[in-house]
């Protein structure tokens, strides 16, 4: 039965939710609208749990349908294909707040699909997809401890804005998305233009206040039309669990204190193998349980060490950063490189500079194509964690980490008008023991500065963690992999000395107070300053010049009406410039032209050729042109593409010239001066006006060259 619900916010937006209209065979569904943006969100679970796994198999998919904005997909097939990076990021944004709210021992496959059916630019579908997923799951029979909601916050002209529209987003200093329940924030994603910690905290709390109102709205829907939830089998401590704990707990606790990740992993592996050898005969098919029990013992001990002993597995105190090292300029032929190491996490970042023609063009749910001039790509090869796996295309995690690092650095990049290069940074994770995304931010700062990119300020990132045991809360600075896996929070903060540029948080528990968030941000700032000290000690400021192997860019702004003159009929003119100089040329409708060359001389020559095309010659101007034709009375010189002037025989030299061919040949370059432009626009040139006049030994030799000789108009080929 179809039901409709409407939520009207005090902040000026509306949610329109319909249940029971679409997708009747899904476990749960909702049709959600805001403005002209509408999505169908479905939730489906398998009937039985998947066997042999120790993780929850949740899949969240965000589908962009170009018909939603009245566009036909490009390409030969004319249909949507692989998910775009934007769709992947929104899929992750749905997954992160939903995943912690399923029962711990629930192993049924669950798929949530959010399909964009219609969209306007003022109402983005990202937060709507999370809200819709919460409604679909909450009203279904799938076990889910919701509701949750998501809210976006902007910062425009000194004020925070809830769900900013398109115009406000263009001016906003903040792009913040917060998701959570009425009682807790459990996901944050943000890019900011150096907002301080107090401003970020205020924005997060404003978002959470609105999340509470939306959660109440969702709960009302669930109370009215929600299905009875399926039961989840409760796992009780088994006899085997008690035996493993009794026989191996002390060995496990001892191995946890091994500071080296690989040695610790080997020690735990040996314990697990010993447990299997001891128990599998009496407890066949219990391999998964043995692994789970050992993991639980590790988790309890790590959390006890941190909460009670205030010491971490690698011996650090709670606020201590792992050993740091940094290096810039280590690769000789690339445009820029930086190596950053924090503990056993090591990232190599490499910068490549390209012309404006190298921008990434993105065609998605936008009225117009998006052109990205800065790209940050993150790679996580299997050897970085000692694994053997086939190499695949970048997954969701790689795309998400690359996006986070990209957001962190965008605010400090120079304007395109000051530095017109397209910039690509690739971060290669060479070794990972936690916080590799933040290490990629630090490595990228080093790499950009080494490449001569005039970034406004260096950027660094740090990952914070948290362990909450009853009333004891321990905030951790610079978490390693084990603390991330067994802890309650992963809070990544990146920024400059003056403020935050990117932030990402995933919280596994509720009950985190304002004071805890405040302290986490303060500790992150303190750590960030230490890392920035190292970066600035490694490379104090961006290199004065770009690499010898990077393209040289030259720009010129011309009258937009003359762009067609530079291009020429069928591209003839611009192709001639390219052929003669070996450059690449990018023209824009507003008259801005960019020339890219492998050396400065070619670029400067191309710019001069363009300037000559669009500039009307004036008497007194000097050009270096090419001889195109020779006549008995002089030579025609191309001073610019499509512009010729006559160099009369009397203007070739101070001495008498009997034959033009004695001095010039077709194809010769000659420097000439404009001496006259007649009423018909014909250009007369002189070479001798630029030559030093010698002392005359034979006055007759110079007599006939004292002035240009006239010729009948009908003999001038420029009139034919």
List the predicted regions and their residue ranges.
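Flexible, glycine/charged-enriched surface loops at secondary-structure junctions
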Residues: 104-110, 145-147, 214-232, 262, ...
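Long, charged amphipathic helices and adjacent flexible linkers at domain junctions
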Residues: 228-238, 530-556, 604-624
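Long, basic N-terminal domains or extensions that often function
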Residues: 1-232
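Glycine-rich, flexible beta-strand/loop modules in the N-terminal catalytic cores of phosphate-handling
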Residues: 26-111, 116-123, 189, 330, ...
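Single-stranded RNA-binding regions, centering on S1/OB-family and related RNA-binding modules
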Residues: 551-553, 560-720
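Conserved phosphate/anionic-ligand binding catalytic regions in large, soluble enzymes, centered on
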Residues: 28-30, 123-141, 328-351, 433-453, ...
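Extended amphipathic alpha-helical scaffolds
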Residues: 1-46, 54, 229, 233-369, ...
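Mobile "lid/hinge" segments at catalytic clefts and subdomain interfaces of large enzymes
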Residues: 142-258, 448-544
């Amino acid at each position: 039965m179809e039901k409709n619900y409407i939520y009207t916010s005090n902040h000026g937006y509306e949610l329109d939710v319909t249940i029971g209209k679409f997708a009747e065979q899904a476990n749960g569904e909702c049709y959600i609208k805001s403005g002209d943006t509408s999505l169908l969100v479905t939730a489906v679970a398998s009937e039985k749990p998947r066997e042999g796994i120790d993780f929850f198999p949740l899949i969240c998919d965000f589908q962009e349908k170009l018909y939603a904005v009245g566009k036909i997909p490009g390409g030969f097939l004319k249909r949507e294909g692989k998910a775009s990076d934007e769709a992947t990021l929104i899929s992750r944004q749905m997954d992160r707040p939903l995943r912690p709210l399923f029962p711990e021992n629930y192993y049924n496959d669950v798929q949530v699909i959010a399909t964009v059916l219609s969209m306007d630019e003022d109402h983005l579908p990202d937060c709507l997809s999370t809200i819709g997923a919460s409604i679909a799951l909450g009203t279904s029979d799938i076990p889910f401890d919701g509701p949750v909601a998501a809210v976006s916050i902007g910062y425009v002209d000194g004020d925070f804005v809830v769900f900013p529209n398109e115009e406000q987003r263009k001016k906003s200093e903040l792009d913040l998305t917060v998701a959570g329940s009425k009682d807790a924030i459990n996901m944050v994603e943000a890019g900011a233009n150096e907002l301080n910690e107090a401003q970020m905290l205020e924005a997060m709390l404003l978002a959470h206040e609105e999340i509470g109102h939306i959660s109440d709205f969702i709960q009302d829907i669930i109370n009215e039309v929600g299905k009875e939830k399926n039961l989840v089998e409760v796992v009780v401590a088994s006899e085997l669990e008690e035996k493993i704990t009794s026989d191996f707990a002390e060995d496990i606790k001892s191995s946890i204190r091994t500071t080296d990740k690989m040695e610790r992993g080997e020690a735990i592996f040996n314990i697990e193998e010993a447990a299997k050898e001891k128990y599998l005969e009496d407890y066949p098919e219990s391999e998964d349980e043995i692994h789970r029990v050992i993991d639980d013992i590790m988790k309890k001990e790590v959390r006890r060490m941190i909460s009670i002993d205030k010491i971490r597995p690698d011996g650090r105190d709670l606020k201590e950063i792992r050993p740091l090292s940094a290096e810039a300029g280590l690769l000789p032929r690339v445009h820029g490189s930086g190596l950053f190491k924090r503990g056993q996490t090591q990232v190599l970042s490499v910068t490549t500079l390209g012309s404006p023609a190298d921008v990434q063009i993105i065609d998605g749910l936008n009225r117009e194509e998006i052109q990205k001039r800065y790209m940050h790509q993150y790679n996580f090869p299997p050897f970085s964690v000692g694994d053997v796996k086939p190499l695949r295309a970048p997954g969701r995690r790689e795309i998400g980490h690359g996006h986070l690092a990209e957001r962190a650095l965008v605010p400090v990049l120079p304007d395109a008008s000051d530095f017109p290069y397209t910039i690509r940074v690739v971060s290669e994770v060479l070794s990972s023991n936690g916080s590799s995304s933040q290490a990629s931010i630090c490595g990228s700062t080093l790499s950009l500065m080494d490449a001569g990119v005039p970034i406004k300020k260096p950027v660094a990132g740090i990952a914070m963690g948290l362990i909450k045991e009853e009333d004891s809360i321990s905030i951790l600075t610079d978490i390693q992999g084990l603390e991330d896996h067994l802890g309650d929070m992963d809070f990544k903060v990146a920024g400059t000395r003056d403020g935050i540029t990117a932030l990402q948080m995933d919280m596994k528990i509720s009950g985190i107070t304002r004071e805890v968030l405040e302290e986490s941000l303060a500790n992150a700032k303190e750590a960030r300053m230490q890392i920035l000290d190292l970066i600035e000690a490694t490379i104090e400021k961006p290199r004065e010049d770009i690499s010898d192997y990077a393209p040289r860019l030259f720009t010129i702004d011309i009258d937009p009406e003359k762009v067609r003159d530079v291009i020429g009929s069928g591209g003839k003119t611009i192709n001639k410039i390219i052929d003669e100089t070996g450059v690449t040329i990018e023209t824009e409708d507003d008259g801005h032209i960019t020339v890219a060359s492998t050396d400065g001389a070619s670029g400067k020559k191309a710019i001069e050729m363009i300037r000559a095309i669009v500039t009307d010659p004036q008497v007194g101007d000097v050009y270096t042109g090419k001889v195109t034709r020779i006549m008995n009375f002089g030579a025609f010189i191309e001073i610019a593409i499509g512009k010729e002037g006559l160099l009369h025989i009397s203007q070739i030299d101070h001495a008498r010239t009997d034959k033009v061919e004695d001095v010039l040949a077709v194809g010769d370059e000659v420097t000439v001066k404009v001496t006259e432009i007649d009423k018909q626009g014909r250009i007369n040139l002189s070479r001798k006006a630029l030559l030093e006049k010698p002392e005359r030994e034979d006055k007759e030799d110079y007599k006939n060259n004292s002035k240009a000789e006239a010729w009948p108009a009908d003999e001038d080929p420029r009139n034919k």
